[in-house]
From Swiss-Prot:
Protein name: Disintegrin and metalloproteinase domain-containing protein 20
Biological process according to GO: male gonad development; proteolysis; single fertilization
Active site: 343
Mode of membrane association: Single-pass type I membrane protein
Domain Peptidase M12B span(s) in chain numbering: 207-400
Segments in the Extracellular topological domain: 207-693
Other known facts: May be the functional equivalent of ADAM 1/fertilin alpha which is a pseudogene in human.
Annotated organism of origin: Homo sapiens (Human)
Location (main, coarse): membrane
Signal peptide: 1-31
Length: 726
């Protein structure tokens, strides 16, 4: 691949731009570390089964490990946001042709957790290979654990990573604090317009950094030219780095991997500043059009330079400066993860720590010298927060699977314009009986995917494809000519349901139902005085919404539409993290509720749901008690001749034995939107419905037999009585 001439030309242009006005480059100096710092200990993790009141919530695993002269109990649960859906992996042929695959990735074997009884401890492990691989941080000590592959007794090796100068020489960033400060002054003038960005939504702390990792050819060769090995190394490193960022409410999500399996398209040895510059140019022309990302990092196995990594400070989302280069010299995952965490911190606006910067440990991740640590300092928090607010919201929403790919082509498992299907790679298509490699249907196949497609054929008309969920929902059936299930339709807003409730957007809500969902079946909605007292306070326990950073007090007419208040609570539920239960005594009443504070990225279980009754002929709509008059009256029971119910598209969904559109003529039910229901009502029943139906059929003979026995017994008693009288 010829890259020399265009790189030189573009490099000169970019140097003039970068030197005067853009982002500073930071670097970590490098030494020649030994393979591991201490002799390992052999440990055998033992699973701990928790019982009784001390049992962990579902989804947690607990193991006991003994090392360093002590026994530790590790609690961990699956890290669910590590990968983007359908993670693409790019490789190259010997002729430098691009190949793309979406390999099966076991996404339920990467864990985050903590050590029992050790505040601020941190655990990041994977169990994908059958044993534990990853990091344990206990107080000021950091350990790396690896399984012994040939062990028949689940043995592992635990290495303590020391910070002694004799084993971990002091390594200095290649950029001085003075130079960073000077370049930041230049950057402030360049980024002036960014300071005017909208602050809407800034209080939601949760951020999602979409990371693409590129692995150079030398590192690939070091991994025995095994792309799968490279992938697993990347997964484990990113899982560890993600654990560093969780206290900042940041999820680092891997959205793609690019492995230079043929050769390096640019020099990766020598001065890392040049490597970073060249990589930024390469990314701009080769990666941006393929993968969505906030930042891209190049992993290299450099053994000549004197730096561990470089990155553009505040480069996040600022193409082409949203890049970093990290030296992955050996197999020490934890040590390299600290380097990646540091360089990614620079991308997010963090500078090197000064003497006034502190964290829970002796050293912090953004220290100018490389230190064994897992915590960010107070300075890093402040710099990240300032940088995130001022640079917009590019890292706020999680990646949507459909947006990961930017290059439309046959073979990416996404059915695009002009394609009948897309079975993916050659290997995947070989196993697909319905779709061909050229994204057309196999001869004789009617479909290749969809709820209403089975064995390459459309499911028969009247096959249930979407079951009714609750009394405010409606079922849908396949039409026999399409692979898709009809759009989801539900009962029209404003139709009564349950007791003193109305359907609204597919659900039946009232205050009592919500209290039972939170506090159990005995709970019920509190008196109106609780709503009046609490929801007019304008705090996290009682409010009618959030504007900017301020909780809005409820006006008296809207108090029933703020936060739900309950009574008759006997049990405090296990709520999601960051949730708080409030008990408030008001005269002879105890009011119970939950909080919702700024920065929470989980659903608010305590806000009164839209559609909840708040007065006669009134329901809550967006924290306001609104009249139901505004709800559509285009369809009413009379429209359906009292033989059906109106759906959200203002069409009649007819009862069985009546036909749409107005339930006037004989038919089989359904609506113009639901697809045709089965002619035999039994065909439309779900599995549970069929079981209940069959159970009833089985009971009928038994009931008949019992009635017969009672009849015989009655006749005998009557005859016996007549004999006695005679």
């Amino acid at each position: 691949m010829a890259v020399g001439e265009p790189l030189v030309h573009i490099r000169v242009t970019l140097l003039l731009l970068w030197f005067g006005m853009f982002l500073s480059i930071s670097g970590h100096s490098q030494a020649r570390p030994s393979q591991y710092f201490t002799s390992p200990e052999v440990v055998i993790p033992l699973k701990v089964i928790s019982r009784g009141r001390g049992a962990k919530a579902p989804g947690w695993l607990s193991y006991s490990l003994r090392f360093g002269g002590q026994r530790y109990i590790v609690h961990m649960r699956v890290n669910k946001l590590l990968f983007a859906a359908h993670l693409p992996v790019f490789t190259y042929t010997e002729q430098h042709a691009l190949l793309q695959d979406q390999p099966f990735i076991q996404d339920d074997c990467y864990y985050h957790g903590y050590v029992e009884g050790v505040p601020e401890s941190l655990v990041a492990l994977s169990t994908c290979s059958g044993g534990f691989l990853g990091m344990l941080q206990i107080n000021d000590l950091v350990y790396e654990i690896k399984p012994i592959s040939v062990s028949a007794t689940f043995e592992h090796l635990v290495y303590k990573i020391d910070s002694d100068d004799t084993q971990f020489p002091p390594m200095r960033c290649g950029l001085t604090e003075e130079k960073i400060a000077h370049q930041m002054e230049l950057q402030l003038s360049y980024n002036f317009t960014l300071k005017q960005s909208s602050f809407v939504g800034w209080w939601t702390h949760q951020r999602f950094v979409e990371l693409v990792v590129v692995v150079d050819n030398i590192r690939y060769l070091f991994s025995q030219s095994n792309a799968t090995t490279v992938q697993h190394e990347v997964f484990n490193v990113v899982n560890i780095v993600d654990s560093f960022y969780h206290p900042l409410e940041v999820d680092v999500i891997l959205t793609g991997i690019d492995i230079w399996t043929a050769s390096n398209p640019l020099p990766t040895s020598g001065d890392l500043d040049n490597v970073l510059e060249d990589f930024s140019i390469w990314k701009n022309y080769n990666l941006n059009n393929r993968l969505q990302h906030d930042v891209a990092h190049l992993f290299i196995k450099d053994t000549q330079g004197m730096k561990l990594g470089v990155a553009y400070v505040k480069g996040i989302c600022q193409n082409p400066f949203n890049t970093g280069v990290d030296v992955f010299e050996d197999n020490r995952l934890v040590v390299f993860a600290i380097t990646l965490g540091h360089e990614l911190g620079h991308n997010l606006g963090m500078q090197h720590d000064t003497q006034w910067c502190v964290c829970e440990l002796q050293w912090c991740i953004m220290h100018a010298y490389r230190k064994v640590t897992t915590k960010f300092s107070n300075c890093s928090y402040a710099q990240y927060w300032d940088s995130t607010i001022s640079s917009g919201l590019c890292i706020q929403p999680p990646p949507y699977p459909g947006n990961i790919f930017r290059l439309k082509y046959c073979g990416n498992l996404v059915v695009e314009e002009g394609e009948e299907c897309d079975c993916g790679t050659i290997r995947q298509c070989a196993k697909d009986p319905c779709c061909l490699l050229n994204c057309t249907l196999h001869p004789g196949a009617a479909c290749a995917f969809g709820i209403c497609c089975k064995d390459c054929k459309f499911l028969p008309s009247g096959t249930l494809c979407r079951q009714q969920v609750g009394e405010c929902d409606l079922p849908e059936w396949c039409n026999g000519t399409s692979h898709q299930c009809p759009d989801d339709v539900y009962v029209q807003d404003g139709i009564s349901c349950n007791v003193n409730a109305f359907c609204y957007e597919k659900t039946c809500n009232n205050h009592d139902i919500q209290c039972k969902e939170i506090f159990g079946q005995d709970a019920r909605s509190a008196s109106q005085s609780c709503y009046q007292e609490i929801n007019t306070q304008g705090n996290r326990f009682g409010h009618c919404g959030i504007v900017g950073t301020t909780y809005v007090k409820c006006w008296t007419p809207d108090i029933m539409c703020g936060r739900v208040q309950c009574e008759n609570v006997g049990v405090i539920p296990n709520l999601i993290e960051h949730s708080t239960v409030q008990q408030f005594h008001l005269n002879d009443t105890t009011c119970w509720g939950t909080d919702y504070h700024l920065g929470m990225a989980i659903p608010d279980i305590g806000e009164v749901k839209d559609g909840t009754v708040c007065g006669p002929e009134k329901i809550c709509i967006r924290k306001k008690c609104a009249s139901m008059v505004h709800l559509s009256q285009a369809c009413q029971p009379k429209t359906c001749n009292m033989r059906g119910i109106c759906n959200n598209k203002q069409h009649c969904h007819c009862n069985h034995e009546w036909a749409p559109p107005y339930c006037k003529d004989k038919g089989y039910g359904g609506s113009a939107d639901s697809g045709p229901p089965p002619k035999n009502n039994m065909e439309g029943l779900n599995v549970m419905g069929k079981l209940r139906y069959l159970s009833l059929l089985c009971l009928l003979p038994l009931v008949a037999f019992l009635l017969f026995c009672l009849h015989v017994l009655f006749k005998k008693r009557t005859k016996s009585k007549e004999d006695e009288e005679g």
